[in-house]
């Protein structure tokens, strides 16, 4: 929707289309190993969208995990390098394709000289994608309306994925894939998952994603990046006041309160402020 149309190199675009992962209905695992799409990150030039600030490109991705995003170029022609990683993920209860008869399917991998069970290989590959390659993550789970498996079959793998992302503070959001994303039941489940995982949970129908949905997903991911620096701008003359001066003390108290409440970039939106004697307002 928002990457392929902006790839100027026709041959690169065709190769990328050929490299896109397959998908199908049912319980059979379609992915066998991590796949980088495209092999070389696609560089695209995005037009400035209505209502956006000059020089602020609006990148997008479709699924899984997006590593190595880099923005460059002038304000008139913002560029972005984007690459998708499609990986097996952690095994969902009831999925098929990881067994040969009654025994685990054994596979050869770059990470071991010996053959290892497919489930183990999938776990190792997914962990490497999360820890070593991805810049941001998208956890795709479901309410159980998209296929043959019930909601509870996904919970263990869902929790494992979130645990891995939280362990390294990787920015991510959760997509709740549903045939009825706007129903009361789905909205209620999304609220429960948001409370459980303390991150944005967006109900969507992945088969019917629109550009607006993708922009909304990316906006929420941007709000999950950790705050590493906060700058305060105060009147120059206040810097000459002693720390114990009532005005200086109130400024320091206000700044400390802001720092204590800001952990992710999205916390700026929720920043609350009560006017005091000297500090009457904040501009952020």
Located regions from the model:
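Conserved G1/Walker A P-loop phosphate-binding module
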Residues: 1-102
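Canonical P-loop GTPase G-domain recognition
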Residues: 179-236
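A solvent-exposed, charged loop/short amphipathic helix patch at secondary-structure junctions
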Residues: 98-116
């Amino acid at each position: 929707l928002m990457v392929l149309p902006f790839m100027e190199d026709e041959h690169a675009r065709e190769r990328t289309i050929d490299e896109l992962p397959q998908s199908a209905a049912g319980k059979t695992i379609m992915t066998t190993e991590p796949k980088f799409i495209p092999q070389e990150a696609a560089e695209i030039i995005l037009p400035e969208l209505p209502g956006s600030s000059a020089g602020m490109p609006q990148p997008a991705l479709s699924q899984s995990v997006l590593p190595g995003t880099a923005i460059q170029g002038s304000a008139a022609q913002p560029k972005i390098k984007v690459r998708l990683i499609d990986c097996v993920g952690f095994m969902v209860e009831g999925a098929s394709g990881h067994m040969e008869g009654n025994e685990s399917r054994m596979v050869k991998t770059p990470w071991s000289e010996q053959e290892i069970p497919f489930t183990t290989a999938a776990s190792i590959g997914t962990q490497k994608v999360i820890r070593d390659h991805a810049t941001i993550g998208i956890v795709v789970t479901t309410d159980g309306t998209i296929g043959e498996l019930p909601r509870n079959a996904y919970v263990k793998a869902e929790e494992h994925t979130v645990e891995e992302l939280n362990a390294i503070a990787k920015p991510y959001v959760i997509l709740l894939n549903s045939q009825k994303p706007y129903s009361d039941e789905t909205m209620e489940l999304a609220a429960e998952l948001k409370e459980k995982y303390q991150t944005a949970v967006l109900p969507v129908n992945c088969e019917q994603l629109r550009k607006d949905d993708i922009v909304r997903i990316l906006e929420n991911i941007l709000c999950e990046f950790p705050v590493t620096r906060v700058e305060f701008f105060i009147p120059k003359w206040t810097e000459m006041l002693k720390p114990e001066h009532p005005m200086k003390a109130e400024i320091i108290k206000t700044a400390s309160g802001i720092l204590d409440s800001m952990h992710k970039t999205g916390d700026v939106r929720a920043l609350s402020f009560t006017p005091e004697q000297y500090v009457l307002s904040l501009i952020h």
